[in-house]
């Protein structure tokens, strides 16, 4: 069973350049610019896994989160300013995450690559602390701390553990 996948759609630079507002191209080498968010009026954030392509909206499963929390919006705006100012993905996500209050709950917005390794370990620790059930949905899982913790949790058989991954990434 040979599968043929079309190349991903490409943005036409002249289309982006014709937009009536300033844009900044971020080089995707050596690090991929993978951010996907809108900060609206300093009050709301729309974010998730969705690439802003027709295929992403119509053919792919994605998750989208909308939060109306000015403190969270401020953190995303801070990350945007990092990207806008430096124009370099590798220099993004190094700001220390701030704990913010969202309706009486503490929250932090984490950005990568700056905090990527730390986040991998934090996610692994959170998985390891599960008491009842874990559900994992990721196109691919290659992070050592996460894989190791999943293997340990599975071996202990103490929680209901299930995961979905992109099968094309497994072949």
Give each language-model segment a name.
Residues 1-171:
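Charged, low-complexity intrinsically disordered terminal segments
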